Amino acid sequence: MSSKAEKRKYTYDWPMAALTVDGIVFGFDPNDDINPLKILLIRRAEGPFIGHWAIPGGHVNIGQNEGLEDAVRREVQEETGARFEYLEQLYTFGDPNRDPRGRVISVAYIALVRKADYEAVVGGDDADLAVWYPVNKLGQIKLAFDHRKILSLALKRLQGKIRYAPIGFDLLPSKFTLGQLQQLYEAILQRDLVKSNFRRRILSMGTLIEIGSKAKLKSGRPAKLYQFDKKKYEKAVELGFNFEL
């Protein structure tokens, strides 16, 4: 094949869909006793759905050979300034009518961040505002496209996975109290947990390190601080350990 033929662009004989990514970024605020679980949202500065809230995301740079994970990291950073380590693919959304501009297929990802690292998120690119919004108040706002459906599925995935994997530690400060850990689980699972049972179970796993210092609380005595021992957890998993709560 000649070099000219190799460089020639291939043209399909049928219409092609646009490929996009969406980044559902969860954060946790232990200082918010009412609405501690947050989601990172942007307000759309352009149509369609101008002025509506939306999940950060956008088109994959096909021409630059960009991968899906690279695309979602780039889009979230461009639109909010946030970066993250934990990332997992949620689902592919391809309803023919999900975008009024044409056929758009979106691959959605869940990301977890320590909210304290990104308190001052700023809207950028085609977003005029970025905010941490309480998950339990999403029903009060207008969301663009099929993003309400996407967020609902993302929350269900988070609720399911936190029961058998230690992903919650990607949302907590690196040093945390058992009270903050229980607060996180209750916020995600959306139900109260028995304090004594929760602490007994979590401490029996042997994956927490008591660091020897204490945190001052709003009321009551200072609480012990802990860290998650990831290496010990990974070693325990190799031996058949089950994190299930």
What are these regions (language model features)?
Residues E210-L245:
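Long, intrinsically disordered, low-complexity Ser/Thr/Pro-rich regulatory/activation regions
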Residues S2-R8:
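Short Pro/Gly-enriched beta-strand edge/turn motifs at strand-loop
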Residues M1, F28-I42, E69-T80, A223, ...:
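Core subunits and conserved enzymes of cellular information-processing
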Residues Q183-D192:
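Short helix-coil junctions and helix-kink-helix linkers
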Residues R8-A54, E69:
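N-terminal strand-loop-strand
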Residues I110, V121-L158, L171-G179, N197-T207, ...:
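NUDIX/MutT-family hydrolases
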Residues A17-L19, N35, I62, L68-R73, ...:
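Active-site segment of metal-dependent pyrophosphate-handling enzymes
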Residues N35, I39, R43-E46, I50-H52, ...:
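Short, His- and charge-rich active-site/binding loops that engage polyanionic ligands
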